[in-house]
């Protein structure tokens, strides 16, 4: 049987398409850059930036969402990179340091306001 597999077949957590903005900063705080999240899940995200960030780079994201009072702060690591003309698309694996962050991310994924 040759059924087409869904895109999330290799992920532990499904992703949802989003159109959210974020500020990405390097883990050591040496720079901050704007980004646009393309998809988001409990385990990570795909985003576009104007410049490439190497695989293995520790980053922090401050995600803006219409229904949140404050940005959602997430920590992670760049796990893949595709260079585009004038931009870069990258994948991030999240490291949830607290249940509060995970709970807020779950609420964000359940909300309809950001679609």
Q: Regions from the language model: what does each represent?
A:
Residues 72-74, 90:
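PAS and PAS-like sensory/regulatory domains
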Residues 1-40, 106-115:
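N-terminal helix initiation/capping motif
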Residues 33-35, 74-81:
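Short beta-strand-centered aromatic/proline hotspots
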Residues 81-108:
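C-terminal structural segments of small proteins and small subunits
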Residues 20-60, 91-93:
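Short strand-loop-strand
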């Amino acid at each position: 049987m040759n059924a087409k597999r869904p895109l999330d077949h290799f992920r532990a957590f499904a992703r949802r398409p989003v159109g959210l903005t974020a500020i990405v900063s390097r883990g050591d705080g040496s720079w901050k850059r704007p980004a646009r999240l393309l998809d988001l899940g409990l385990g990570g995200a795909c985003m576009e930036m104007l410049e490439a960030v190497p695989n293995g780079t520790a980053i922090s994201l401050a995600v803006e969402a219409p229904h949140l009072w404050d940005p959602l702060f997430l920590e992670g690591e760049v796990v893949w990179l595709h260079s585009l003309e004038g931009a870069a698309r990258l994948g991030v694996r999240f490291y949830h340091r607290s249940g509060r962050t995970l709970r807020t991310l779950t609420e964000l994924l359940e909300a309809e306001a950001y679609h």
